[in-house]
Regions:
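Residues at helix-coil transition
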Residues: 11, 40-44, 68, 76, ...
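The canonical Cys-X-X-Cys-His
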Residues: 35, 39, 63, 68-77, ...
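Electrostatic cytochrome c docking/interface patches
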Residues: 40-66, 82-86, 152-158
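Short flexible/disordered coil segments
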Residues: 46, 77-89, 112-116, 141-154
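Gly/Gly-Pro-rich "capping" loops immediately C-terminal to redox-active cysteine motifs
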Residues: 1-26, 60-64, 76, 80-107, ...
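Short sequence/structural segments immediately N-terminal
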Residues: 1, 7-19, 26-34, 42-49, ...
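C-terminal capping alpha-helices of c-type cytochrome domains
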Residues: 24-48, 101, 120-157
Length: 158
């Protein structure tokens, strides 16, 4: 899945102005595979990037209903995804990342996804995207993806 994402960024199919300059420097398929292999060894910091607003509990409850009705069939009820079908892990992803990706898919800036994603997200309002992103970020990250050492925030991240 990471190889496809990097290839899509490099070709301009996937909108990511931050990564594009780096991805386009990868000279061939082996370089893409090498970088994807390395990225695949990285882990998710525990409890990193959760929605922290005072209304988080309400957002999680509302987002859970949206997730169960629109996302769980492909991404699994626990958000673990289906690697063999190229459905990514959503559980424990960073709230802002999830919100940005779903907004870009809904708004047509990201076109490297199955038609079902466009259909599912086309009916989501901005508020719905905040709710479902809050819920997905609150899910437990699969154990195999967690960092075992604490990650400290930089001043920019705080």
């Amino acid at each position: 899945m990471l190889i496809k994402q990097l290839a899509d960024i490099r070709s301009g199919v996937r909108y990511n102005p931050t990564m594009y300059p780096f991805a386009r420097k990868l000279p061939d398929a082996q370089a893409l595979a090498d970088v994807a292999g390395y990225i695949g060894t990285l882990c998710f910091p525990l409890d990193s990037g959760k929605y922290e607003g005072a209304d988080a509990a309400g957002h999680i409850a509302g987002g859970k209903l949206l997730y169960e009705n629109n996302c769980a069939r492909c991404h699994q009820p626990n958000g673990a995804g289906k690697k063999e079908a190229l459905y990514p892990v959503l559980a424990g992803q960073h709230f802002r990342y999830l919100l940005r990706q779903m907004t870009e898919i809904r708004d047509g800036k990201r076109v490297d996804v199955p038609a079902e994603m466009f259909e599912a997200l086309s009916m989501f309002s901005n508020a719905d995207l905040v709710l479902v992103s809050t819920y997905m970020a609150s899910l437990n990250t699969p154990e195999s993806l967690l960092c075992r050492t604490p990650v400290t925030k930089t001043k920019k991240q705080e």
